[in-house]
Curated annotation (Swiss-Prot):
It catalyses: tRNA(Ile) + L-isoleucine + ATP = L-isoleucyl-tRNA(Ile) + AMP + diphosphate. This is Isoleucine--tRNA ligase. Keywords: Aminoacyl-tRNA synthetase, ATP-binding, Cytoplasm, Ligase, Metal-binding, Nucleotide-binding, Protein biosynthesis, Zinc. The gene is ileS. L-isoleucyl-5'-AMP binds at E554. CDD domains: Anticodon_Ia_Ile_BEm, IleRS_core. Monomer. Signal peptide: none annotated.
């Protein structure tokens, strides 16, 4: 007889190899055909809601790993919340306006000069919508579930209308104003930039020390003294109108070889070193406070213009001379202090960064090229004391990567100062995963200047502002709401298609326009105002959503971006934060922690991972990262992730194979009647479940990743499943011992599949489809396992046993190395108590020790002789097992017998086989 035929071997159609790149699209097609997104919502309708509001990615270009990290993290959260019974709709969004799309069209050969603004904008819209379709497909391929058939898009008429209404409400509260102020200006983009659009890179700049002669000493300083200023922007010297000193700093008049120079005393050594002064020839002649120097008048070094000495608290002794070159047209601090002294705002630079006619002899020069011309002129006038070059961190345009300047231009602003405290209070009432997140956004809002919301471009939402014939600004509740209504009906392109009078309410009149003529604003809104309006355009307008959102989750760069603009517009109009909880993630780096770049050849993109390995590998990788900081990815890291995936898959497959003949409705054993080892595993499952649920609640996916591996490797592979083979394959099909184990195995399989479902979405679904007798058609429509109290005494007892088992395994390994045994079933184990542990007493309550240790025979005695090896949990001796090997179960037995034609079988196998014959 072939005894193999009598074994109950695992059976399942669940394949060993994942084949994810081919399998996943098939699973996704099924989800789409069944409209699983809405099915999941319907299941939880009327339950408590959970709203994760999607920050809109920019609709341009292919997805990078940062996109994947972001969307997969969001999907973990929404899927988990759904399986916990929450009504958790997820509406993905896209940010669609702005310069990159204009530039992309130009690169494609679209000549905007050959068409009207409205026509060019239409092409921008077409391009953005094409990009959305491409990105949408890629997001869905990652297994992200959401309302992709009806996403929110910032160019949709209803969204633009909501944005205009926010603008109107802010204007109504006096928070929107126009002013000529220095703003970040990008000559390469020909537009103003918000702080969120600035990034810092190293730049080589001229460093100059310049002497300003005293023109009117006011009886304070010597008439022939000179103030020394230091700057790294020589091109701004033509705009100088003042020298700022700190009112409380001490200043000295130093005689250096007959020349008298005024600088801060705290910086005198640094200045002397920079200007190569011989210290022996330096003499401090007079001392003043900055307050005493106020209103002294200096002479501009090469223009017929005075430079007034003024006081400012922004002056520091970190660098320079303590006498700060002040040009209100080219610096925020300069502008603010200049306002107090009613100084003129001079900014002779055009949109391209070129000097205008107001720049005199520098007219036509690009500002950076003018640096040399200015220093040459200063040298000619004898005012340049030192020219050097330094490399320093300097603001750049985040899109073009070119340097930006401060330039005073007429711009529209949203007042931060008027709502700053309200925003800070709202931040205090917001929850954060980590305290540094709160500190980061709090400090950014606290230190933030006014928000420049105007842009000198065409692809964006127009500022709904009109001008009367006399130049008066028209921005009333009536006019703004009328524009919002027009945008809601026609879209914002109507602004560029109609005359101003046709955009105003019918019969509108204004005293500043006696002839009934009006003009409209040509600037558009900052794209951060677009996305920052999503709480109104999406949360408050979509019936399935609600305001405020439970959560915003984006990259850490959004503390100064979307998180910031959203809370600003929300607090300004609604008085509360648009999010209750804020979570951020880091950036994706290569395996060595370097930034990915084509030049380094270290770029990994989602499409590549999905096609080569599958979306579930990308998702498992996300769960393996400490995403709060920057994360790493490489081929080697993905290989390690694939190895972990393979272990998870094979473990699930083993369990599937061994419950193929089990029906939980008819074959389950009540918990009270389970074998103790099975009750131990059931309690370990409950412990693992509680920990996993807690980790999901706290967004700690790395803990889940590690604990899943630990549970699979330590509890299942190394013990329970290995121990179980002797029972599942060998014992009688309906025996109590086998059904007891299958009862627990089935529970582990079902619960683990559910717990893994938010992460391994496709694999969990595939496992579910092969699991017999499950009630729900999809694991994603099932509920998470409930957290059940564990039997702690049982767990403690079995943890001690598992430690003893580790000692036995160490002893077996030694015996194997000494050729006493080969496989563990060839072993006979004798265990005795020792000074460290009373093993003989402890083991009296355990049955079938030979099965638990996966050996043939176990003997427990009170004491062993000196030949025994002492371990932490007893003295252990390993010998070769007595008797002969059973041909069916491979255990050694002294009772192999011949019953009829059944030879070389142990008593257990004889009994099982006889029942089959």
């Amino acid at each position: 007889m072939d005894y193999k035929e009598t074994l109950l071997m695992p059976k399942t159609d669940f394949p060993m190899r994942g084949g994810l790149p081919n399998k996943e699209p098939q699973i996704q097609e099924k989800w789409d055909a069944e409209d699983q997104y809405h099915k999941a919502l319907e299941k939880n309708k009327g339950n408590e809601t959970f709203i994760l509001h999607d920050g809109p990615p920019y609709a341009n270009g292919n997805l990078h790993m940062g996109h994947a990290l972001n969307k997969i993290l969001k999907d973990f959260i929404v899927r988990y919340k759904t399986m916990q019974g929450f009504y958790a709709p997820y509406v993905p969004g896209w940010d669609t306006h702005g310069l990159p799309i204009e530039q992309a069209l130009t690169k494609k050969g679209v000549d905007r000069k050959k068409m009207s603004t409205a026509e060019f904008r239409e092409k921008c819209k077409e391009f953005a919508l094409e990009q959305i379709e491409l990105q949408k497909k890629d997001f869905r391929r990652l297994g992200v579930r959401g309302d992709f058939n009806d996403p929110y898009i910032t160019l949709k008429p209803e969204y633009e209308a909501a944005q205009i209404r926010i603008f109107g409400e802010m204007a109504d509260k006096g928070l929107i104003y126009k002013g000529k102020k220095p703003v970040y200006w990008s000559p390469s983009s020909e537009s103003s930039l918000a702080e969120a659009e600035i990034e810092y890179h190293d730049k080589r700049s001229a460093s100059i020390y310049v002497a300003f002669d005293v023109k009117d000493d006011k009886g304070v300083v010597d008439a022939d003294a000179k103030f020394i200023i230091w700057t790294t922007t020589p091109w701004t010297i033509p705009s100088n109108v003042a020298i700022t000193v700190h009112p409380e700093l001490k200043y000295g008049q130093y005689n250096v070889n007959g020349e008298k120079y005024i600088i801060a005393e705290a910086l005198s050594d640094a200045v002397a070193e920079a200007l190569d002064w011989d210290k022996a020839s330096i003499k401090l002649e007079k001392e003043y406070t900055g307050k005493e120097l106020e209103y002294v008048v200096a002479q501009h070094p090469f223009l017929d213009r005075e430079s007034l000495v003024i006081n400012g608290d922004h002056v520091t002794t970190d660098a320079g001379t303590g006498c700060v070159h002040t040009a209100p047209g080219h610096g925020e601090d300069d502008y603010i202090v200049g306002q107090k002294y009613e100084l003129p705002v001079i900014s002779p630079i055009d949109d391209k960064g070129v000097f205008t006619e107001e720049g005199g002899q520098f007219e036509g020069m690009f500002y950076d090229k003018a640096n040399k011309a200015v220093t040459d002129l200063l040298t000619e006038k004898g005012a340049l004391l030192k020219l050097d070059f330094i490399t320093h961190s300097y603001p750049h345009d985040w899109r073009t990567k070119k340097p930006v300047i401060f330039r005073a231009t007429p711009q529209w602003f949203a007042s931060i100062s008027k709502v700053r405290q309200d925003i800070l209070d709202a931040i205090e009432n917001t929850n954060f995963k980590v305290n540094w997140g709160k500190t980061r956004i709090y400090n950014m809002v606290r230190d933030r200047g006014e928000w420049v919301i105007s842009r000198q471009r065409v692809w964006g939402v127009p500022l709904p502002v009109f001008y009367a014939e006399n130049g008066e600004i028209i921005m009333t509740k009536e006019t703004v709401n009328h524009v919002a209504d027009l945008f809601a009906e026609h879209g914002s392109n109507i602004w560029f298609e109609r005359e101003a009078k046709d955009l105003l309410p019918e019969g509108f009149t204004h005293p500043g326009s006696p002839n009934g003529t009006f003009t409209k604003e040509t600037d558009i809104m900052d794209v951060w105002f677009d996305s920052g309006s999503s709480h109104r355009g999406v949360l408050e307008t979509r019936p399935e959503l609600s305001f405020p959102a439970d959560m915003y989750l984006e990259g850490s760069d959004q503390y100064r971006g979307w998180f910031n603009s959203s809370i600003t517009t929300s607090v300004a109009t609604r008085g509360v934060s648009p999010y209750k909880f804020l979570l951020s993630h880091g950036f994706v780096m290569d395996g060595e922690g370097k930034k990915m770049s084509k030049s380094l050849g270290n770029v990994i993109v989602p499409d590549q991972v999905v096609k080569q390995k599958g979306a579930d590998i990308a998702r498992l990788w996300v769960s393996s990262t400490d995403y709060l900081a920057d994360v790493r990815i490489s081929d080697e890291i993905l290989k390690q992730t694939s190895d972990v995936y393979r272990k998870i898959r094979n473990t699930l497959r083993f369990m599937l194979g061994n419950i193929n003949d089990f029906n939980p409705d008819t074959d389950s054993i009540p918990e009270s009647e389970l074998l103790e080892v099975d009750r131990y595993l059931l309690n370990r499952l409950r412990e693992f479940t509680a920990s996993t649920i807690n980790n999901y609640e706290n967004f700690d996916y790395l803990n889940i990743y590690q604990e899943v591996q630990n549970f699979i490797n330590v509890e299942l592979s190394n013990f329970y499943l290995d121990y179980g083979k002797d029972i599942l394959y060998i014992e009688q099909r309906d025996s109590h011992i086998r059904r007891s184990m299958q009862t627990v195995l089935y529970q582990i399989l079902v619960d683990m599949t559910k717990l893994l479902a938010p992460i391994l979405v496709h694999t969990a679904e595939e496992v579910w489809s092969h699991t017999p007798h499950v009630k729900e058609e999809s694991v994603h429509l099932a509920d998470m396992p409930k957290v059940v109290e564990v039997d702690q005494a049982l767990l403690d007892k079995w943890r001690t046993f598992m430690n003893l088992r580790d000692d036995v395994n160490r002893a077996l390994e030694t015996a194997r190395n000494e050729k006493v045994i080969g496989k563990s079933l060839e072993a006979k184990v004798t265990i005795a108590s020792n000074d460290k542990f009373n093993a003989s007493e402890f083991l009296t309550s355990f049955d079938a020790l030979h099965q638990l240790f996966i050996v043939s025979q176990v003997k427990v005695v009170d004491k062993l002789d000196d030949q025994a090896t002492a371990y932490e949990h007893g003295d252990i001796v390993i010998e070769h097992a007595d008797g002969e090997k059973c041909e069916r179960c491979w255990n050694y037995s002294e009772d192999l017998g011949a019953v009829d034609e059944l030879t070389h079988l142990c008593p257990r196998c004889q009994q099982v086989v006889k029942s089959l014959v």
